């Protein structure tokens, strides 16, 4: 193993152990080549909803603004059509 490979391996190990390490954000939709986000794709939409039912902002998810607007619209449509809940599961 040469020095370059060893340094890369040590860097990766340090990043995994460091609790303050932040992974570089990227847009999932750009990587996948998605053109339009569909309101019927509930599995994808649920990934962008927080525990309390709020839409997660792009600065936290890394989603590009073009796709974030489509994502917001798709989530709102799914909520309006009762495909998704507006809030989390309340227990009275």
Curated annotation (Swiss-Prot):
Disulfide bonds: none annotated. The keyword Nucleus does not apply. Pfam families: Ribosomal_S18. SUPFAM superfamilies: Ribosomal protein S18 (SSF46911). GO terms for cellular component: cytosolic small ribosomal subunit. Part of the 30S ribosomal subunit. Forms a tight heterodimer with protein bS6. Belongs to the bacterial ribosomal protein bS18 family. Binds as a heterodimer with protein bS6 to the central domain of the 16S rRNA, where it helps stabilize the platform of the 30S subunit. This is Small ribosomal subunit protein bS18. It comes from Ralstonia nicotianae (strain ATCC BAA-1114 / GMI1000). The lineage of its organism: Bacteria, Pseudomonadati, Pseudomonadota, Betaproteobacteria, Burkholderiales.
């Amino acid at each position: 193993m040469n020095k370059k490979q060893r340094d890369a391996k040590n860097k990766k190990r340090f990043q995994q152990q460091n609790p303050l390490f932040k992974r570089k954000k990227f847009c999932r939709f750009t990587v996948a080549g998605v053109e339009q986000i569909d309101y019927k794709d509930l599995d994808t939409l649920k990934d962008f909803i927080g525990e309390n039912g709020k839409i997660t902002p792009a600065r936290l998810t890394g989603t590009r603004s073009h796709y974030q607007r489509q994502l917001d619209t798709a989530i709102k449509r799914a909520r309006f059509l009762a495909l998704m809940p507006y809030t989390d599961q309340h227990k009275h």
